[in-house]
Amino acid sequence: MKSILKKAKHFFHTNETVNGENGGEKTAKESESQQHHQQQQQHDENGANPPDQGVDEASNVSQSQPTTSALQTSTSLQPSSSLHQIPQSQSSLELTTNPTQQLPTTPTKQLPTPPPPQQPHSQQQQQQQQQSQSQLNNNDISISTNTNNTTNNTNNNNNIDSTLTTPVPSSENLATLSTSTTSEQQPNSQPTPNNTNTTTSPPPSSASTSNLSTSTTTTTTTTTTTTAAANENTNTTQEQTVSPNKPPQPPNALSQSTTSSSTSSTSLLSSTFSKFKIKLGSGSTKNKDSSSAPGTPHINNNNNTVSSSNKNRSTLVITPGSVNNNNNNQNNHKNNNTTPDHPPEEQKPVEKEVITIATLADFPEDCQKLIRISGIPEEKLIKNIQILAYVLHFRTGRFFKLVDEPPREPRKKFVSERFNDGEKLLEPVEPALLKKMYKDSDQVGKGGFGTVYFAKSTKEKRLVAIKKMPHVTKRQQQQNFREAAILAKCDHPNIVKLHTCHIDKDSNLWIVMEFMEGGTFEEAAKAWKFNENNLAYVAKELLKGLQYLHENHMVHRDLKSANIMMSVEGKVKLIDFGLCEDVATSTPMHMVGSPFWMAPEMIQQKYHSTPVDIWSFAISLLEMANQRPPMMESAVKAMFTVATDGATGFDDPALWSDCFKDFLSLCLKQDPAERATAEELLKHPFIKKADSRDNMENILKKIFLTNSLMNSGF
């Protein structure tokens, strides 16, 4: 009898646990319980095993023996029934969801339930939830988004990259969750969120905390984060990359627990921004499903400057001043490497610095040094300070203006229409084939406008001279084509002949000209002491070439010994027409050329024309007679003296005849209008003293063959 009463007592205790508050059905259940006790008593008397199942028709609940460690309950309740959470010592009622699926944003309607028993850590969990909610409400949210500013874009799919960054609480076990989202936006419509491959849960509430809990594990034990981890994550932003096939890993402070209580802050953030696709990682990490539209503006939170990008991803960063994200922003800026999607505005030309001069002491120190080296008397410099300013401008590139200088009329830019077709001279040849067309190239000279080589043309089976010049900028192209066009129009035995033009792979223009075996007038003057007959021969050849140029309204403007070629055959020709000017429709004024051969009117920055070539021609003859240019010790002194006093003359006048002196005096008149022309000089008696060509061939062969042997090491 005692055993029967003990079992009955246990039965009533179990029935109360299952049915809870259904007290209205107690009477019917007691009658059924008596019948059940009788069956068990009969079973005990017979010594058989207890039945497998006891069916409670009122509750329809399956039960097992009381000694079972876990009570697994499968319920099919009436609308008035409710579930009671079983104490933790017995079992756990778990709702396991696939972490790759998204929970519905609207929770299902739950049946009324009594408050569940408190878990050991429930009070701590509620405190964490309240603190996290207050932190999220009080702290600003830094939103970093990639968007296309063009609202009238005709594309139907415009990708928007967004980065959602929550500020890090300074005293809680929270970590910054950096979220990058991608959504498709239709024109003039709201963005449609993409599928989310993350486990999210709506914000917990007092009525449905236990029913809406989701977990990726099989236990409900809550793990607590350490204070050290929270402190470490306070000043840093941790970012993780989410694989399309794997659920995202939470930050360090949240990675130890994925239950509802430990992920309360994550659930709040996920539910608030559930319409975004979460992609944890740096701003520079690319995703197949997300791409920023070209030309996306970039605002740096440090200085709020705006830029845009065509190639790289850019982000729109709006950071409140209360959150310190300088390090993260700097890293994002480095990763983005944004470049403008439109060419930068052309830089305005830098205004030239003009130095006002009243006395010699007003010149800068570098100019003062050049003045001291020249050795020009101070009284002469003060008297001609304007000329000194012109000379120093040519030598240093600085601009000077006298205090009492009268205003000058602006310079006119003249563009000749006769020599603007040099591009037509280009021969259509692949740049890679140029080395095959011209073999055995060897450098023979180098100047300010390019480098000269001689080579063998495989096509023409002859030696040629090739002048290579940089051909990149617009100004270089204009000057190079201009020189080629002038040479193409010149057809004279005393002017070097043009063959063709090419452009190589390094953007250099090749001007292919006739090859002259020999050297320059400068080299010959240093190697040989010429007499008047030799000089008369050279003067006659040069004057014929100058006469041809001047009659065709062209001025060389850079005539000097280095631009005069002499061959072993006795030929004398003008080369290097890079500064040649068309004076048929213009009168140039600016200062160009070489300082020792420059005419006075050019140094004085006056309008000049063909007489400047006559002056330079005479200085070249003086160089040949003296075996050096006049006043070689100082370019400033040479230019200043020429502009004020004129040329100096012979080093040893006694060695030269009056005929030669008279010839040079006609060429070196200070006033260009009084200077003799090339046609007049060809009629001068000095020209009649010219040596024969055969004799000049022998002299030039001795000069240049000796130089060749010396250069070859023999």
UniProtKB/Swiss-Prot annotation:
Residues 62-83, 95-111, 120-166, 178-241, 254-267, 300-314, 324-337 have a biased composition (Low complexity). Residues 1-267, 281-349 are annotated as: Disordered. The active site is at D558 (proton acceptor). Its cofactor is Mg(2+). It catalyses: L-seryl-[protein] + ATP = O-phospho-L-seryl-[protein] + ADP + H(+); L-threonyl-[protein] + ATP = O-phospho-L-threonyl-[protein] + ADP + H(+). It holds the Pfam family Pkinase. ATP binds at V444, G445, K446, G447, G448, F449, G450, T451, V452, K467. Residues 1-12 have a biased composition (Basic residues). Residues 23-35 have a biased composition (Basic and acidic residues). GO terms for molecular function: ATP binding; metal ion binding; protein serine kinase activity; protein serine/threonine kinase activity. One of its GO terms (cellular component) is cytoplasm. Residues 84-94, 167-177, 282-294 have a biased composition (Polar residues). This is Probable serine/threonine-protein kinase mkcB.
